[in-house]
């Protein structure tokens, strides 16, 4: 059991859309990811996702609305709900989701699909 310094961990990588695992609890992974640009539309059949903004601003877009998130705010996206994430400038985001959740969910494999299990 070791404490995690989020600023140090976010400083350890530069790529966007590539979640890094920094902790696990009760079948869930705590991941750090940097967003910039727009991610593809997708959904997760079996997993809810929690997006918590550490630094910057991001939005979660749904078919019928857009939710803007700023530092210290989070949103839980229920399983099965079509969505995409976006950030005009770089945002640092914590994700809480079940182990082995594919970041692109139902979307076809693409350059956005991150390798699973990458830890920092």
Where are these regions (language model features)?
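A short, N-terminal "cap"/entry segment at the start of jelly-roll beta-barrel domains
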Residues: 1-31, 108-120
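Short, conserved beta-strand element in jelly-roll/cupin
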Residues: 34-35, 44-62
């Amino acid at each position: 059991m070791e404490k995690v310094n989020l600023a140090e961990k976010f400083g350890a990588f530069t790529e966007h859309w590539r979640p890094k695992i920094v902790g696990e609890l009760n079948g869930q992974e705590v991941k750090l990811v940097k967003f910039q640009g727009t991610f593809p539309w997708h959904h997760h059949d079996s997993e809810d996702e929690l997006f918590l903004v550490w630094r910057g601003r991001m939005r979660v877009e749904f078919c019928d609305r857009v939710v803007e998130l700023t530092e210290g705010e989070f949103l839980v996206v229920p399983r099965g709900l079509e969505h995409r994430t976006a950030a005009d400038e770089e945002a640092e985001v914590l994700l809480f989701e079940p182990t082995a959740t594919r970041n692109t969910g139902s979307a076809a494999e693409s350059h956005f699909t991150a390798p699973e299990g990458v830890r920092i």
